[in-house]
């Protein structure tokens, strides 16, 4: 495989997988460009109180099963399923199925079947690229990516995703809503047959101040830093909460520095066991090592 093609395949798999986990865990990857809802500008006090209680409870359960879809412009569209945990940094196992975009095409060029198994640990992530890709890199099918390498691999998009992944929990989506000056209860709806309350809000970076936010100064500063790093001007978030006080569904949409973004995530089985191990060393290769080995070859 040509070095340039290998780089596209490997980098695409890394960034898509990290985009997935950032979206699933509510890392603030989406930013909306739609105008503010009618009656926006004043947060509903009852909704703020309810969301503060929901965020506190969500922070105690520490794991969940997820199912979702993510789209980033013409770069990637995909589905993801698996489990994530956040008791000590973000960990989890997801299966990613690519349904379109340039990343999907790059994976096909590398002999992939459109699916990648991913394992997330505190400082690194592993992707099972399949037998066809493994045959081009010495037979090892698991590729390791260190989060600190993402900026080098993916430029601005990688830098943003590194920060999001290492700071993401399902609480982040709730924090975004609490930062919105227009957060409100948007009605009662069923989520896959389960009664839920929907909360909606739009976070405008230019208007994030302590005066119209339910976050403290430290939380607000951290959120502003994440949104600014991603090139976000406005982020639209909707969360559906079940009668047990835990999120059942989350949507984000809008624009980022990496392109138009939208995601939908369903949460279930809170408290499920999440056990993630590194793949066997004998079947693993570091992506940067692959690139170093190919650097002297054709490009």
Task: Go through each PLM region and give its residues.
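N-terminal export and membrane-targeting signals
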Residues: 1-15
């Amino acid at each position: 495989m040509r070095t340039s093609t290998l780089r596209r395949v490997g980098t695409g798999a890394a960034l898509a997988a990290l985009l997935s986990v950032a979206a699933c865990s509510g890392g603030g990857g989406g930013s909306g460009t739609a105008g503010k809802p009618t009656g926006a500008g004043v947060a509903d006090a009852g909704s703020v109180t309810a969301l503060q209680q929901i965020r506190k409870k969500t922070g105690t359960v520490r794991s969940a099963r997820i199912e979702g879809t993510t789209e980033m412009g013409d770069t990637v569209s995909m589905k993801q399923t698996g489990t994530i945990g956040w008791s000590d940094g973000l960990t989890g196992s997801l299966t990613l199925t690519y349904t379109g975009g340039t990343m999907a095409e790059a994976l096909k060029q590398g002999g992939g079947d459109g699916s990648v198994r991913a394992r997330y640990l505190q400082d690194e992530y592993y992707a099972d690229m399949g037998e066809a890709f493994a045959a081009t890199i010495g037979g090892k099918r698991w590729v390791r990516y260190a989060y600190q390498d993402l900026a080098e691999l993916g430029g601005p998009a990688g830098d943003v995703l590194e920060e999001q992944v290492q700071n993401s929990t399902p609480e982040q989506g709730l924090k975004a809503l609490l930062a919105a000056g227009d957060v409100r209860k948007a009605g009662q709806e069923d989520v896959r047959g389960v009664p839920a309350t929907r909360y909606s809000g739009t976070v405008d970076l230019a208007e994030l101040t302590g005066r119209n936010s339910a976050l403290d100064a430290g939380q607000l500063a951290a959120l502003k830093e994440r949104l600014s790093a991603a090139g976000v001007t406005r982020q639209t978030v909707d969360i559906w909460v079940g009668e047990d006080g835990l999120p059942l569904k989350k949507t984000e949409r809008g624009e980022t520095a990496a392109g138009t973004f939208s995601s939908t995530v369903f949460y279930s089985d809170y408290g499920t066991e999440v056990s993630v191990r590194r793949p066997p060393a004998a079947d693993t290769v570091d992506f940067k090592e692959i690139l170093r080995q190919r650097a002297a070859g054709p490009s």
